[in-house]
A protein has these predicted regions:
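Conserved C-terminal guanine-recognition region of P-loop GTPase G domains, centered on the G4
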Residues: 56-79
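Alpha-helical, hydrophobic structural elements that either
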Residues: 86-90
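P-loop/Walker-type NTP enzyme "switch/lid" segment
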Residues: 1-35, 116-124
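Inter-motif core of Ras-like GTPase G domains
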Residues: 31-52
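Short histidine/acidic/glycine/proline-rich micro-motifs that form metal-
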Residues: 50-52, 79-84, 128
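NTP-binding/hydrolysis catalytic cores, primarily Walker-type P-loop NTPases
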Residues: 119-151
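Beta-strand-loop-alpha "switch" segments that mediate conformational coupling across diverse proteins
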Residues: 82, 92-121, 135
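Structural beta-sheet core signal
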Residues: 24, 46, 76-78
Length: 151
């Protein structure tokens, strides 16, 4: 399911300010306010699928982030990554060659959609799934970036 369909929206700005993390899940088509969101962010994660269709929108999003004047670092998360897929590897190599930092490559896993449908994390749904370790590594990377920002 789409990310925005499985999480709750916080409409209370005072409560949001007390939270350790705030997630802004934008639509697939960028809308107004993106520059403000970028400037307010500590860290920006841009998800993409390893496909030629996602390359142009991902690069366009990264350009918008750069042009926003934010001080936040921006990283790409490659979802549905297949390590043995030629196109998957070539796209990652291209991005890295262009200096685009990739914070995580999350592998394909049926457990992701099943966990979302069940309303639980993939670690709760299937703790032995091969996707749990990369997601934990992503979470650790986000926490490390937050420590750098606050440390």
């Amino acid at each position: 399911p789409q990310g925005g369909s499985v999480h709750e929206v916080c409409d209370d700005p005072d409560f949001a300010e007390e939270c350790d993390f705030q997630v802004v899940d934008t639509a697939g088509v960028l809308v107004g306010g993106v520059n403000d969101w970028c400037r307010a962010a500590n860290l920006i994660l841009v998800p993409m699928l390893p496909s030629t269709r996602d390359m142009e929108p991902t690069l366009r999003t990264l350009d918008i982030v750069r042009e926003s004047g934010t001080g936040a670092k921006a990283y790409v998360i490659v979802n549905n990554f297949y390590a043995y897929g030629t196109l998957d590897r070539q796209l990652v190599e291209y991005l890295e060659g262009e200096g685009v930092p990739i914070i995580a490559k999350i592998p394909r896993a049926v457990a992701l959609s099943r966990a979302a449908a069940a309303g639980v994390s993939v670690a709760e749904y299937d703790p032995k799934s091969h996707v749990v370790a990369p997601i934990e590594l992503l979470a650790d990377s986000v926490l490390n970036e937050e420590e750098k920002n606050n440390g």
